[in-house]
């Protein structure tokens, strides 16, 4: 479910917080160098006490949230009347707000290569109803250098209902053994419909690959869709297909580790052959034959949700 923008009233209530400099163990507030224009009379403060002087017109234009807030009548007290500017405390850190405010101000925001910062900016943009920033981030999610965390990208796209972005990210998750416990925390954040589709994709690839490698027959098992020979006749190089079964299960274990099949495409399965280039004297199937079939099998598997 897409997070809803924050309530205007909730921000208005914290628009005159206690002086941060008097809070216990507080770091004295300082200004972001990019937002020190004294003609900007709205001061926003991050959770780590970095302040930003913002022009009202920028906030009104970029944010439905601030547009509504600034339209409200402001309570005036004798103490507030002596202040030149309000200081509005926000929940987000300076890592997030610094980039967010630069985006709405037309300034360079630097790289967005940290997933946590990217996610934080997106959440803040939704919270403050900044549709332009949300749309920009949606376009960037498949372009920025975040591809080392494909499962998190998939989860984020799923949370916001971004179908095409989720489809693109699902392919990159194939390099991950998502059934391992270390991925549980991320999987728990994925909406159930998208989670089911992702789990089905990973499982379907493994099942389809296994069916291509081992084909039970009425009389004997066939390997790698070999029609000319079962490679299971007594007297073959591997009696009772022991070698073939060993090779097949080694490939299955490889697909458990990386369901994208990258290990198989790299030919790591050849270490199981112990130098044997021929499997069966009858059909003359060789390492190259198996390699070709394996590559074809992997290419034929579904690759996205």
Feature locations, PLM:
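Long, hydrophobic/aromatic-enriched structural stretches that serve as scaffold segments
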Residues: 82-139
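Short amphipathic alpha-helices and their capping/turn residues within compact interaction modules
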Residues: 71, 75, 105, 109, ...
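Acidic, serine/threonine- and proline-rich low-complexity regulatory tracts
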Residues: 2-6, 136, 142, 146-305
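Alpha-helical oligomerization interface recognition
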Residues: 41-81, 129
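Alpha-helical oligomerization/assembly modules used to build nucleoprotein complexes
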Residues: 77-82, 115-116, 145-151
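N-terminal BTB/POZ boundary and linker segment
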Residues: 1-59, 95, 102-116, 304
């Amino acid at each position: 479910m897409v997070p809803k923008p924050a309530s205007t009233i909730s921000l208005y209530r914290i628009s005159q917080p206690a002086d941060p400099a008097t809070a216990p163990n507080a770091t004295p507030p300082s200004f972001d160098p990019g937002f020190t224009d004294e003609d900007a009379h709205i001061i926003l403060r991050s959770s780590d006490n970095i302040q930003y002087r913002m022009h009202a017109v920028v906030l009104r234009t970029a944010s439905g949230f601030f547009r509504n807030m600034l339209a409200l009548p402001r309570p005036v007290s004798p103490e507030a009347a002596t202040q030149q500017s309000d200081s509005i405390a926000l929940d987000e850190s300076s890592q997030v707000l610094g980039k967010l405010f630069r985006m709405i101000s037309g300034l360079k925001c630097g790289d967005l290569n940290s997933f946590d910062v990217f996610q934080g900016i997106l959440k803040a943009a939704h919270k403050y109803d900044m549709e332009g920033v949300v749309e920009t981030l949606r376009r960037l999610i498949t372009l920025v250098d975040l591809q080392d965390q494909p499962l998190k990208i998939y989860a984020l796209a799923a949370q916001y209902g971004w179908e095409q972005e989720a489809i693109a990210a699902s392919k990159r998750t194939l390099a991950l053994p998502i059934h391992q416990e270390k991925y549980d925390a991320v999987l728990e954040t994925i909406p159930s419909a998208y989670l089911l589709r992702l789990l089905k994709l990973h499982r379907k690839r493994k099942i389809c690959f296994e069916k291509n490698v081992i084909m039970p027959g009425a009389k004997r098992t066939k390997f790698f869709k070999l029609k000319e020979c079962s490679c299971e006749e007594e007297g073959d190089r591997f009696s009772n297909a022991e070698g073939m079964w060993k090779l097949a299960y080694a490939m299955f274990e490889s697909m458990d580790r990386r369901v994208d099949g990258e290990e198989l495409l790299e030919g790591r399965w050849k270490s199981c052959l112990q130098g044997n280039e021929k499997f069966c004297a009858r059909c003359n199937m060789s390492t190259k034959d198996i390699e070709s079939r394996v590559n074809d099998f992997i290419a034929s598997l579904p690759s996205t949700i």
